[in-house]
């Protein structure tokens, strides 16, 4: 706004140029021009009825002040009523003072629907946006769910409620099965850390060889050897429990007691012991190698499969420590420390966790773990249903069978029978004999079929989804490992992280410059709404 002071008389105008009449602009006229508005004037920085020129994601429109005044609570309504340029700038992303145009870096498709809202007062849902993106856009422009049209409100609310679990119900759709780009990006970011590490290329190749069976021929051989060692360890543990080996160890223990030595010092079969030592050496090599080659030590200890590897070798070393504590003492000393042998037996039982090492090489086991992780609610509901049913039918069976000597002596004793019956296992070790007891057993079995089937269906759907998703993710990572990962990581080996960031900024500036050169010098005249 220009302020003119002519011979003591002040003139103000909103125009950038003011043409004074000839008498006022004649010779000897004193004119004072100022570009700042007078503080004591009530004139706004823009006219209240002036059309609002906006640019939303490249879509330019002129919005009438009358249409915006109908909805003063929206962002554009508040922008139209802004009292100053500073207040208006806080409501938009950028403002071009020369063109008097407000810029918003938002979705242009939603903006077209927003224009329809200012015309009709109703907002319609866009199929091109998911419910969450649509809700974010509506919140940004100051719209609530109450402005949704009646034809779209029910559909929007239904999609918003069912979207988090859509992959359970429609798991066959490609969008629910295909791996997310972020999942592959996580793998890329992990591998990119080798660029700044010492011997990064060698460590990267060794890491991919151990972690990805489809990376190369050596990785496939390594995977086969690892699976064979795990199976051999499990087989040795099972063979050790056979009666022949148990009788041999019992005879050796009797001979040790007769000789005045502790029976805990009896050693296992030499062949099985050597096989056990070999398996432990291989497992220790795997754990230590993965720890040394891991791109992130913190993430290594947070990964469930790595924790399983550690637990698989931990019992052996704990047994060695217990053996050192027991010592090789004889007589009374060995008897005093003999109770520590029970601890050794507990440590040996922990060897059963080695079977979980197969999860590293099995998509099904990993999918099962992911299913249990994301199905804790359904598992909790299943246990709650079983607990209620077992408690009810156990009390009924105890009341009907307590006079009979068939094992229903107490309600806690009936819990075993109720659990076996509700899960339709039916061992038959305890059965009712009275008519009332048999009716209670029939109700328990039918109730178990209904109760167990409901959550199991949901858990099965989740397992199917995670299995297909895991297979798709492995295929995507395997395909990208051969060429895309090699190109990415080769560039990482040559430049540092700072250089990568600089190159990204330069490329972004170049793209911006290209867009500016391609843009027309005169913007098209926006449409009026």
Curated annotation (Swiss-Prot):
It is found in: Cell membrane. Residues 1-217, 294-304, 362-376, 468-529 are cytoplasmic. The keyword Iron does not apply. Pfam families: BTB_2, Ion_trans. Residues 500-529 are annotated as: Disordered. Residues 412-423, 424-431 dip into the membrane without crossing it. Keywords: Cell membrane, Ion channel, Ion transport, Membrane, Potassium, Potassium channel, Potassium transport, Transmembrane, Transmembrane helix, Transport, Voltage-gated channel. This is Delayed-rectifier potassium channel regulatory subunit KCNS1. The gene is KCNS1. The chain crosses the membrane at residues 218-239, 271-293, 305-322, 341-361, 377-398, 439-467. It is a multi-pass membrane protein. GO terms for biological process: action potential; potassium ion transport; protein homooligomerization; regulation of potassium ion transmembrane transport. A motif (Selectivity filter) lies at residues 424-429. Its main location: membrane.
């Amino acid at each position: 706004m220009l302020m003119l002071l002519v011979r003591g008389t002040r003139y103000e105008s909103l125009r950038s140029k003011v043409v004074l009449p000839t008498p006022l602009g004649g010779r000897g006229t004193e004119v004072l021009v100022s570009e700042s508005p007078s503080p004591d004037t009530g004139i706004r920085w823009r006219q209240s009825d002036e059309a609002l020129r906006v640019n939303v994601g490249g879509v330019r429109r002129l919005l009438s002040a009358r249409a915006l005044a109908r909805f003063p609570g929206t962002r554009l309504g508040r922008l139209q009523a802004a009292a100053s340029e500073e207040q208006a700038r806080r409501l938009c992303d950028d403002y071009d003072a020369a063109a008097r145009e407000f810029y918003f870096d938002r979705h242009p498709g939603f903006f077209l629907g927003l224009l329809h809202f200012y015309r009709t007062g109703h907002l319609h849902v866009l199929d091109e946006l998911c419910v969450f993106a649509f809700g974010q856009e509506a919140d940004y422009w100051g719209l609530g769910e109450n402005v949704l049209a009646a034809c779209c409100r029910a559909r929007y609310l239904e999609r918003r409620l069912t979207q988090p679990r859509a992959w359970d119900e429609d798991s066959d759709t490609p969008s629910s099965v295909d791996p997310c780009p972020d999942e592959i990006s996580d793998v890329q970011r992990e591998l990119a850390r080798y660029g700044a590490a010492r011997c990064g290329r060698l460590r990267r190749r060794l890491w991919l060889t151990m972690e990805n069976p489809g990376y190369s021929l050596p990785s496939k051989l390594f995977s086969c050897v690892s699976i064979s060692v795990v199976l051999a360890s499990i087989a040795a543990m099972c063979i050790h429990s056979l009666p022949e080996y148990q009788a041999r160890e019992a005879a050796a223990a009797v001979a040790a007691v007769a000789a005045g030595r502790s029976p805990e010092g009896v050693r296992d079969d030499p062949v099985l012991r050597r096989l056990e030592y070999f398996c432990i050496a291989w497992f220790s090599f795997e754990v230590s190698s993965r720890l040394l080659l891991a791109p992130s030590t913190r993430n290594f200890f947070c990964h469930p499969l790595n924790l399983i590897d550690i637990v698989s070798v931990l019992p052996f070393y704990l047994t060695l420590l217990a053996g050192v504590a027991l010592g090789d003492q004889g007589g009374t000393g060995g008897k005093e420390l003999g109770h520590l042998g029970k601890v050794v037996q507990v440590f040996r039982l922990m060897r059963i966790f080695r079977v979980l090492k197969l999860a590293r090489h099995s998509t099904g086991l990993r999918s099962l773990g992911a299913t249990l992780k994301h199905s804790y609610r359904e598992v909790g509901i299943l246990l709650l249903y079983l607990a209620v049913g077992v408690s009810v039918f156990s009390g009924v069976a105890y009341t009907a069978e307590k006079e009979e000597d068939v094992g229903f002596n107490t309600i806690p004793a009936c819990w075993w029978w109720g659990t076996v019956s509700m899960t339709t296992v039916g061992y038959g070790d305890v059965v009712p004999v009275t008519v009332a007891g048999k009716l209670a057993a029939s109700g328990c079995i039918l109730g178990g079929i209904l109760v167990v089937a409901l959550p199991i269906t949901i858990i099965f759907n989740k397992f199917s989804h995670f299995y297909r998703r895991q297979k798709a993710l492995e295929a995507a990572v395997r395909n990208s490992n051969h060429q895309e990962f090699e190109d990415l990581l080769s560039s990482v080996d040559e430049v540092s992280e700072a250089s990568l960031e600089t190159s990204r900024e330069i490329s972004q500036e170049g793209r911006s410059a290209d867009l500016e050169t391609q843009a027309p010098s005169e913007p098209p005249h926006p449409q009026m709404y």
